[in-house]
């Protein structure tokens, strides 16, 4: 109703969310550049960022002193990753570590933790029992049990994975009291930011888990998307404001294991003040292969990395349209008519 009544201003936004989803984030590269390089630049009040996996990496780039340069480093490193044959989890983790190191640069950690108004938070999943093992049989069994437990009830996922919320300790985010699953809140510090970001994107089975993160409870930390794929959390926890959520689809899927569970929906109260920006079917049709880039592209274009890289770069270029449409909707006031209640 706030947008219907008064439009959208940069200061109306209190939280910005970024989903996991591998390369799907690429279509928001230009929108992120506009938002963090221009739209939010005069802001004084804290803007809380919450992401999982690639969403966390996006926001770590955005929270640096020169966000445009950091975003370009991230985009270049992410698109440029290549693998010989079928990579091992250790090899994929090593490549991901290179991406995180490259996007942070020499001063990124310090700049993120001293940013004047951006407050970075991101999700990880602390594995329990065999879900935390790197032995393939035990890990497979642990993940299978997690799938079965989650199918019965999302709360049962907490038997296998606990939330690990890394947050900027200068201001506790409004969503820090999230429930449903066991939660560890972990203050960000120079010693743990890089390892935490790597953990947030460490896909189970595909990558090795991250251990011995300073300031975090002992254990193995995996991709934040396991518990919070597209995030069903109390973003505002009763506070005023809007949650800006650029998302690659209209459906919000709480956890990664919920992707095939059609009836698993987010809590309507958590979505009450969420402004979801989703691409239209026409936009998706205009992309190479008529789809948003995804992890399957690594398999589709195996041995043809140049072709994959070219198509991903084309998708990034085409996504400039999303910036134009957002700016036009906000500045013209048309967003008042365009915005519709989010269907849960």
Tell me what each language-model feature is.
Residues 53:
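Catalytic nucleophile serine of serine hydrolases
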Residues 1-48, 61-344:
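Patatin-like phospholipase
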């Amino acid at each position: 109703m706030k947008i219907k009544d008064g439009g959208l201003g940069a200061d109306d936004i209190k939280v910005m969310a970024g989903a996991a989803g591998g390369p799907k984030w690429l279509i928001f590269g230009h929108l992120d550049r506009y938002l963090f390089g221009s739209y939010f630049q005069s802001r004084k009040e804290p803007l809380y960022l919450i992401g999982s996996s690639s969403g966390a990496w996006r926001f770590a780039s955005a929270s640096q002193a020169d966000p445009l340069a950091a975003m370009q480093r991230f985009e270049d490193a992410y698109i440029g990753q290549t693998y010989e044959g079928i990579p091992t989890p250790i090899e994929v983790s090593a490549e991901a570590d290179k991406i995180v190191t490259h996007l942070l640069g020499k001063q990124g950690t310090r700049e993120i933790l001293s940013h004047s108004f951006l407050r970075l938070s991101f999700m990880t999943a602390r594995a329990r029992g065999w879900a935390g093992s790197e032995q393939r049989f035990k890990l497979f069994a642990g993940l299978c049990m997690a799938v079965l437990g989650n199918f019965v009830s999302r709360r049962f996922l907490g038997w296998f994975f606990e939330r690990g919320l890394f947050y900027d300790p200068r201001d506790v985010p409004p969503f820090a009291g999230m429930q449903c699953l066991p939660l560890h809140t972990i203050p960000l510090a120079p010693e743990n930011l890089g390892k935490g970001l790597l953990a947030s994107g460490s896909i189970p089975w595909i990558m090795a888990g991250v251990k011995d993160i300073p300031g975090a409870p002992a254990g193995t930390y995996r991709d934040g998307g396991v518990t919070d794929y597209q995030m069903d959390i109390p973003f505002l926890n009763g506070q005023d404001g809007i949650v800006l959520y650029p998302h690659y689809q209209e459906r919000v899927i709480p956890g990664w294991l919920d992707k095939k569970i059609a009836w698993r929906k987010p809590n309507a109260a958590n979505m009450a003040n969420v402004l979801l920006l989703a691409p239209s079917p026409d936009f998706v049709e205009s992309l190479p292969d008529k789809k948003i880039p995804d992890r399957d592209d690594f398999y589709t274009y195996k041995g043809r990395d140049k072709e994959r890289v070219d198509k991903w770069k084309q998708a990034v270029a085409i996504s400039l349209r999303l910036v134009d449409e957002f700016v036009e909707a906000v500045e013209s006031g048309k967003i008042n008519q365009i915005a519709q209640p989010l269907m849960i």
